Amino acid sequence: MCGIAGFFGDGDRSAVPAMLSTLRHRGPDDLHIVSGERFAIGATRLSIIDVEGGRQPLTNEDGAVVAAQNGELYNFPTMRPLLLARGHRLETRTDTELLPHLWEDVGEKLPEYVDGMFALAVWDGPQRVGLLARDRMGKKPLYYWLRGGALYFASELKALLAIPGFSRRLNLEALHHYLGYKHVPHPHTIFEGVRMLPPAHRLVYRPGAEPIVSRYWALSFAPGSKSVSDEPAVIDELLTRMRRAVGRRLMSDVPIGFFLSGGIDSSLTTALAAEVAPSRIKTFTLTYAGEATTIGKEQDRRWARWVADRYDTDHHEETIAIEDYPSSLRKILRAFDEPFAGVVSTYFLAQRMAQHVKVAVAGDGADELFGSYLSHRLAAGAQSMPPGMDGPDWEWRAKLLVMSDEEKVELYSPDVRAALAGVSTREHVRSAFECLTARDPVNRVLEAEWRGMLPDQVLTFVDRLSMSHSLEVRSAFLDTEVVEYVASLPGSLKIRNGETKYILKQSAARYFPEDMIRRPKEGFLMPITQWVMGGLQPWVRATLAPERLALHGLFEPDRVGAMVDRVYAPGADYRTVNKALALVIFQEWYEMYLGR
């Protein structure tokens, strides 16, 4: 794992050390740059495999091809002997060394041959061509910015902000979508001119030409050809694939830990790891002090302890309190470099885990694969539609946004309202549903969220918040062979008779008791709604005070004030709190990045 940064073309070579210095949290063990005519590629390294010999960037035999990556290539053990058999000379045990040699054999098709979580950069000097690529699921981030005759790239936005002359201009369209989704959807970023490379895409750059961005892999949710009427056979196949996926994620020369929330996803990952790991595993649970125990989190802790005892793990419990959230918010926002109002509990658990391990395995991706959210239950007809939620699936999905387009427009100042005329997050949702491969209602919503919410929100918070503490997180549910198999299953195996994640629960029943499996989902969430409505009220009101909103003039202060009042009025609901929280986080972000 590492952070990468650099440029292709006529870039400023002196900017690269400054770019990399902002990424030391992603790679505190080493920093190295390789540069030449029309390129510079640098990497900060978190040493996990071949600790002594795996320094990046790496080259082919004659140094003509240079490559670096952020991530892990899980098919490295099978690819390495193939390259050796073809006459390539590999001098380390690191997976990154595959890249320059594989480029020599397959060129721009390189991403199709590697499997794992990665963001990579390759420069071929003789051919004068550069390649950027991002993994299939979107686990690892990669941003790029065109300036003059150069294409700059980096693992995080902060590295691009370090380039001399970078202009920090707010992307109003990205802001508009953020207020609906709680995150900025790719390929947008909050800064004008900067793009995020989408998951499963590559970018090919030749000096003097426009970069070419193309998809190299697509996940199909179309029904598979094999019969799925034999439920035990489906469970057998799923567990076999999951067992292999967990095994691949144990590849490391340093200690590994496991997230263990007490829910099915992380518990099953832990159970499978206990079967295949060569030694006793470490598990970690986040708990909440005080009032949080009244909203179900005590059940999470109880079941996490049960799993830890059942599989004899080296178990650790870490506790956070209400005051930890506002005091850490600016550090959290610096991890994202963008406003982000999604889950941030990973920050606190990763902070504690990093004191014990360098690598962690988590259960993220299971909700989006098997169906767990309100939108999934609505699609299955497992929950009656609330008033006004009838219509096409994309339409009622749009109604689940934190703020509608109309609500946002009501808050905007006249200038912003005019600048955003014609921009619609509702239309953004509709367009996402237009290109789906799935036909049954559950899989249609799962596919839409797989393309959007998973990489833009779930995997974003997992990566940024863990890597801010130099902790690499791996996800067994996001293994390619697991994902492709589950995507091919009908929605009726994912949500059945109102039960979410049906086939996953049936699989977990081979390991856990019924009362654990069938209990209500809590999720890896902080009790932020209760905190905002309770002890955080002074902080919310102070952050959204008129004098602070005047720093940018984007919103009408009286209308924002009225929204805040509704949060603290009798009968306030989760959605109302989320609207105010999205504004609070944007305000904090603005003051940090654009307020001077």
Residue spans for each PLM region:
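Short glycine/serine/threonine/alanine-rich loop segments
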Residues: 313, 338, 454
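Phosphate/ATP-binding catalytic cores across multiple sugar-kinase/actin-like superfamilies
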Residues: 236-257, 352-356, 360, 453, ...
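Divalent-cation
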Residues: 344
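A mobile, often basic/glycine-rich helix-loop segment
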Residues: 138, 370-395
